[in-house]
């Protein structure tokens, strides 16, 4: 049985000194006991609009000077189905949604998902995609939480873009799919490649809307386990963002680390009840990834017992691979964070790049 992590957000032990900085004890399960500090932006850059964290959520933007290019998104992969590349002529696309009733290529007649795959995307298109192998051992279905690198299938972060396109695979105009889009994911960090590598391949695919919450991605790429280029179809299910606070508002936060001196890059994205991060160093071949999930209801207080159950206390780290520190727990203190704020841990300085609130 895999050991369960009991680290929760309340172990961050946030303090608010008089100098308008606050300290957060680092996650004891992911680094040493050193403090990290947050410095808010200067008064010239901090926002005081009604949409700022801690204020009524009348709109979805903290930084009123920047308009969103999209919406926050939470996606869980339901399955991946591999096909030959290139596809034989006249192969129906999408293909996997018809299996096993219609299977002209005589491929495996079942759909499977060997990983726990979650993608979090911000309104400006910054995303973190983490894919962790499910355990083959009975009773170990949960993602790894003790740094087991062998359980990391793939993790990457960057910018996603999407544009309308036409169905390229259906010849009969009457049968062509509508509302198809072409998406591209540019990898700024990739667990399979060194930082700044020019060998990271183009990651793109056509997105076919299946129903109100599911989208099928059709594309192709190199499959390490097959050691070959393969066509793939992935079914993605959208998950609604949930409120984690007593106000009932929903949050999205993006943190970024880019330090050329130390050869460090990192991205943390929180959307609603999920948070994921990835960090890598030029000096290391491997990266660190984390996933956190909110467990419980809205933040609540129990003054009669002299205790308070805060939002931060209800977050739990559900997956971790690697040994670097990731400031995921900082995103749980949205009432303090502002765009442009700086989070320092030892030599590394993270920036609050996006911060959103909506109803």
Model-derived features: positions:
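Lipid interaction determinants
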Residues: 2-155, 165-359
């Amino acid at each position: 049985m895999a050991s369960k992590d009991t680290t929760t957000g309340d172990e961050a032990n946030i303090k608010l000194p008089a100098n308008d900085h606050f300290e957060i004890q680092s996650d004891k399960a992911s680094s040493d006991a050193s403090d990290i500090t947050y410095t808010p932006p200067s008064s010239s850059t901090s926002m005081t609009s009604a949409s700022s964290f801690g204020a009524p959520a009348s709109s979805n933007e903290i930084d009123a000077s920047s308009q969103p290019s999209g919406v926050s998104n939470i996606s869980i992969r339901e399955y991946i189905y591999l096909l030959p590349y290139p596809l034989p002529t006249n192969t129906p696309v999408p293909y996997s949604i018809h299996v096993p009733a219609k299977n002209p290529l005589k491929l495996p007649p079942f759909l499977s998902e060997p990983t726990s795959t979650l993608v979090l995307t911000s309104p400006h298109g910054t995303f973190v995609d983490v894919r962790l192998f499910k355990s083959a051992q009975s009773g170990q279905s949960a993602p790894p939480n003790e740094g087991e690198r062998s359980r990391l299938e793939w993790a990457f972060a960057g910018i996603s873009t999407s544009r309308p396109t036409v169905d390229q695979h259906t010849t009969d105009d009457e049968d062509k799919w509508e509302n198809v889009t072409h998406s591209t994911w540019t990898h700024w960090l990739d667990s399979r490649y060194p930082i700044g590598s020019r060998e990271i391949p183009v990651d793109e695919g056509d997105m076919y809307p299946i129903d109100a919450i599911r989208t099928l991605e059709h594309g192709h790429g190199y499959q390490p386990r097959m050691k070959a280029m393969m066509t793939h179809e992935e079914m993605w299910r959208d998950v609604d963002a949930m409120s984690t606070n007593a106000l009932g508002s929903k949050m999205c936060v993006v943190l970024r680390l880019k330090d050329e001196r130390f050869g460090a890059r990192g991205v943390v994205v929180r959307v609603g009840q999920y948070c994921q991060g990835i960090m890598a160093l030029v000096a290391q071949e491997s990266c660190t990834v984390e996933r956190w999930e909110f467990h419980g209801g809205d933040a609540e207080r129990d003054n009669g017992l002299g205790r308070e159950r805060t939002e931060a206390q209800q977050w739990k780290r559900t997956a971790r691979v690697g040994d670097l520190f990731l400031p995921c727990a900082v995103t749980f203190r949205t009432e303090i964070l502002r765009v442009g704020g700086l989070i320092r841990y030892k030599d590394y300085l993270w920036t609050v790049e996006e911060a959103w609130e909506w109803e």
